Amino acid sequence: MKSNQERSNECLPPKKREIPATSRSSEEKAPTLPSDNHRVEGTAWLPGNPGGRGHGGGRHGPAGTSVELGLQQGIGLHKALSTGLDYSPPSAPRSVPVATTLPAAYATPQPGTPVSPVQYAHLPHTFQFIGSSQYSGTYASFIPSQLIPPTANPVTSAVASAAGATTPSQRSQLEAYSTLLANMGSLSQTPGHKAEQQQQQQQQQQQQHQHQQQQQQQQQQQQQQHLSRAPGLITPGSPPPAQQNQYVHISSSPQNTGRTASPPAIPVHLHPHQTMIPHTLTLGPPSQVVMQYADSGSHFVPREATKKAESSRLQQAIQAKEVLNGEMEKSRRYGAPSSADLGLGKAGGKSVPHPYESRHVVVHPSPSDYSSRDPSGVRASVMVLPNSNTPAADLEVQQATHREASPSTLNDKSGLHLGKPGHRSYALSPHTVIQTTHSASEPLPVGLPATAFYAGTQPPVIGYLSGQQQAITYAGSLPQHLVIPGTQPLLIPVGSTDMEASGAAPAIVTSSPQFAAVPHTFVTTALPKSENFNPEALVTQAAYPAMVQAQIHLPVVQSVASPAAAPPTLPPYFMKGSIIQLANGELKKVEDLKTEDFIQSAEISNDLKIDSSTVERIEDSHSPGVAVIQFAVGEHRAQVSVEVLVEYPFFVFGQGWSSCCPERTSQLFDLPCSKLSVGDVCISLTLKNLKNGSVKKGQPVDPASVLLKHSKADGLAGSRHRYAEQENGINQGSAQMLSENGELKFPEKMGLPAAPFLTKIEPSKPAATRKRRWSAPESRKLEKSEDEPPLTLPKPSLIPQEVKICIEGRSNVGK
């Protein structure tokens, strides 16, 4: 008579029946034993899963629990995850939609072993690997689909890209899968005969994967033909690839950690913009880049809005990760990372130290793509904050998803924070700033020093600012730019054809209230490693994320706004509403500056003095819209001729702003302006301790020569304007012929930044000094406020014997 168990077993479908141990093949008997060690042997074949990790996963559950018990939620979950990770057999049709997104693995299995040369594909010539470098752990790079020819069969491409010729390749390929099984087994708590049934299914899965690996090894030769070897960085001469997906996997394993296997890392998609910072992470035209950061178990699952198949694939993977971490958020929206996505593996309840952590962002190639790819205009902001070398340091990563969905602010043991998305203004563009803190001496993952990627000693910043969707209406639109803080901060304009960096202070002040709402200005200041960040403070607090930064110093009014790329345009600091800081720290609008402000600043400051010049002649130039003004500069009345745009404003003593064409000045800058006429005395502030008229260019001016001071806009603009000094012959002394960009200062105001100046100087003047640091519009105004009165001024005490000639004149005030 049959037992109850046998009878109930017969009632079950064939696949659900319990197969007696005696009827199983010899290779299946071992895993079905109730012993923990034997139960876990089923996953021992997976090279990426060391025995200790596997056994630990098996012992978490009571007797009878199997590694596959976590899959009792449904076999579909296991298969969906396998599909999401693209570990399905090559014959499976479900691998076709994701054929171009399967990463090929090249990694060493253990964290302590040295890294062998990695094979890379032909990437865009500006592509660079950026990753953690404070530890000599294992680093791997996954760049498969660029290697696959466009005409390759999708299934064949998927298999070829996943195949590995060596055992380490296979290990790293299945490492995530094996770890997932182990972790899911550790979460299993329900013993019973179903465990044995699912163990049986696990064995079938293992056999399928083993068979798959054999086929992949045979096809590996095809892939090797498309691989090109590089010392670690794609050379600039590499031809740009076709539009395909790029995968980069950067993982770090500190030597002092006991992590034995890398947790599963889900691919993350980035759509690069064409106007990336040139000397940092720059991605090619229309290709996609998938960044995988597996540092100490950190997983990042982003939002992908391109394909339905990929979307569902990632959704399944996210669900699997939620199960893996023991946390289910059934109601959460796709794209809003859960604590499982944000946090480290919580198995040990202790986060592993690692150099830095990052969040990923979905960025579309161009602003026009936003409407087609993401109608709701979803954006993401990313900031990677540095982590100190000590495990106790608090590292926090903010991700602001400008989505109106209800987000969740999570804070787990790893110190990761998900910032609440601010309500975005649909007319504004997103911004992404990624900052790391590699020192020049720290080796990067590919073995190159930090200086190979970043110029100077500034902390590396991967910055991206998308194109402005809302046109700026003033002449010489202020291009978006990125400030890299450091000992000598860099201002990097983004989106401009002239990608040149000019020295600037790490503070940005928008030139007028009109632009205060434009979120294209970023200030990234170096943050203390131990400082705790509140993500809500960094994320936009209002509808206009004008500035996302750690801190901004308004009193330090350094002009970081560069003028328009077109030379004939004027700098924005003349715009009505621009803030100028006086020597006493007072802030005034540019249109409110008075002569007393200049005199008071010169009296208060020990470094500034007022230079003056008298207009002697105003003539039309051969070029349209340009006037030639002749000045008598200083007490020696050195003759200087300057070519200036007719709308360029100068500050006249006792009168205020004046220009050759007040109508155009008012039209462009909305700045109240008077007509500049012969006899007007233009004043500006200059530095006493400068020997050369230009701090930046270092003009060779003798003590008897005049001070050539350029407008702040000129210095900041990157010296786009050429100024030539010619001796007028009226005075004694030799005149120097100078051709410098934005370096000259004119007595009226600061030099005209947008138009070339021809200055005829009588070098009978004392050594000229130019204030280069006042390049900012606000700072320039400060300079002007400190300008010394000209010879004609009734304040001779301010005019030393060696009065310097400031040809810039009004450009200082124009700030």
UniProtKB/Swiss-Prot annotation:
Q: Which residues carry this modification: Phosphoserine?
A: 82, 88, 238, 253, 775
Q: Which organism is it from?
A: Homo sapiens (Human)
**What does the record's free text say on domains?**
The AXH domain is required for interaction with CIC.
Question: Which residue ranges are recorded for the region named Disordered?
Answer: 1-63, 185-270, 329-355, 397-424, 762-798
Recorded protein name is: Ataxin-1
* Sequence intervals crossing the membrane: none
Q: What is its main location?
A: cytoplasm
Describe what happens upon changing residue 696 to R. Sumoylation reduced to 42% of wild-type
Q: Which cysteines are joined by disulfide bonds?
A: none
Q: Point to the regions of Low complexity compositional bias.
A: 197-226
Domain AXH span(s) in chain numbering? 562-693
Disease linked to the protein:
Spinocerebellar ataxia 1: Spinocerebellar ataxia is a clinically and genetically heterogeneous group of cerebellar disorders. Patients show progressive incoordination of gait and often poor coordination of hands, speech and eye movements, due to cerebellum degeneration with variable involvement of the brainstem and spinal cord.
> What does the further note read?
Self-association seems to be necessary for formation of nuclear aggregates which are associated with pathogenesis.
Q: Which family does it belong to?
A: Belongs to the ATXN1 family.
> Induction: what does the entry report?
ATXN1 protein levels are directly regulated by PUM1 protein: PUM1 acts by binding to the 3'-UTR of ATXN1 mRNA, affecting ATXN1 mRNA stability and leading to reduced ATXN1 protein levels.
Q: Which residues form the signal peptide?
A: none
Q: Which SUPFAM superfamilies match?
A: AXH domain
Q: The cross-link Glycyl lysine isopeptide (Lys-Gly) (interchain with G-Cter in SUMO): at which residues?
A: 16, 194, 609, 696, 745
InterPro entries xrefs: Ataxin-1_N, ATAXIN1-like, Ataxin_AXH_dom, Ataxin_AXH_dom_sf
Please note every region of biased composition (Gly residues): 49-61
In this chain, the stretch annotated as Self-association covers 494-604
Under the subunit heading, UniProt states: Homooligomer. Interacts with CIC. Interacts with ANP32A, PQBP1, UBQLN4, ATXN1L and USP7. Directly interacts with RBPJ; this interaction is disrupted in the presence of Notch intracellular domain. Competes with ATXN1L for RBPJ-binding. Found in a complex with CIC and ATXN1L.
Query: What is known about its processing and modification?
Result: Ubiquitinated by UBE3A, leading to its degradation by the proteasome. The presence of expanded poly-Gln repeats in spinocerebellar ataxia 1 (SCA1) patients impairs ubiquitination and degradation, leading to accumulation of ATXN1 in neurons and subsequent toxicity. Phosphorylation at Ser-775 increases the pathogenicity of proteins with an expanded polyglutamine tract.
